Amino acid sequence: MHFKLFEYTGYASKVFFGENSFHHVGKLLSSYKKAFVIAENRLEPYVNDLKKNLGDARIIHFSSVIQHVPVELIDKARQTQIEEKTDVLVAIGGGSTIGLAKALALRSRHAIIAVPTTYAGSEMTNIWGITTEEGKTTGRDSIVLPQYVIYDPVLTSSMPASLAATSSMNAMAHLMEAIYAHDTNPITYINSLDGMKKLRSGMVLLAARGVLTMEANQLLQYGSFIAGKVLCEVSMSLHHKMAHVLGGTFGLDHSSVHTVLQAYVLEYQWDALTKDVKDDFCTVLDHEYPPAALLELARSMGAPTTLAAIGFKEKDIEKAVDIVLAKPYANPKELTKKGLVDMLVKAYAGQLSQ
């Protein structure tokens, strides 16, 4: 077998996966003096569990979480960090919770222990995002990569089916773009295909049952673990750039934006992909036209499939495209204003070309 030259960078996070694995958090915190625990109030029972095991004085609970991580929230949380003299960060929650922990790690250089309760995948990456008045800024820094990640399906089992649908589609977007990334490699590529298979299987179960069963949950959680891993390993392209612009600039729900955009972005890229890549998409999504498969998966789970449905205004299409084109980045297909405007028009109306 002949391999093309490739580069691969692995990133070191220790992962605990399985039911009731949350107990590892208390053991890991025994090495620190005081933890800054970010968790919404609905997750307070898990915070109380840590307090019971370690003592109230060693756990500082911060419950404010806002999508897209506004800098004002970071300032508030950082001030509490300093006042309480904490020395480690614990994030129990979804992408916004983990995103706040990452923003604080940038300033404090403290380690992160992440316990994801959605399928966003942020817990496996060195990518951070912060929103200011000028919009959303993203970057990479090794300090924001959680040292430990605990995947406990018990914590995700109560997720509403609607959130499970959009959150798993968010994870699917990472896998999709890793497959056609300009800097992909055999390891990331194969993992991406496997992750996509697991997510699709979980989505089919979710759609059939209408509720998040433990079987579907574990498939989706494993797929999201792989999705986060590959998101960290290779570069993302048009889909992620557009999602950050629509979410950060226009205030749209993060996972819903990912859910809606995917089919239309893959259709935009389709002609630029190699036959082998196209064939692999067809195989893992079990469909002769994968963009349509993604649209059908979202629709079958009751997830949004149009930009209009998630509050985006048609008059903002050109503005969004201009922002996306302002800075160059690698993408399988040449990015043109006309092409991207046409893509968003289709996404707004919910109509693929075929």
PLM features: residue spans?
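Structural motif
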Residues: 14, 34-36, 60, 87-90, ...
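C-terminal charged capping/lid subdomain of soluble metabolic enzymes
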Residues: 2, 284-354
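Active-site segments that bind and position negatively charged phosphate/pyrophosphate groups
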Residues: 182-296
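Short glycine/serine/threonine-rich phosphate/pyrophosphate-binding segments
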Residues: 22-25, 44-47, 71, 96-103, ...
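A glycine/threonine-rich phosphate-anchoring loop and its flanking beta-alpha core
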Residues: 12-13, 106-190, 195, 276
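A short, small-residue-rich loop immediately preceding and capping a beta-strand
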Residues: 81-104, 108-119
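ATP/NTP phosphate-donor binding region
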Residues: 1-87, 307
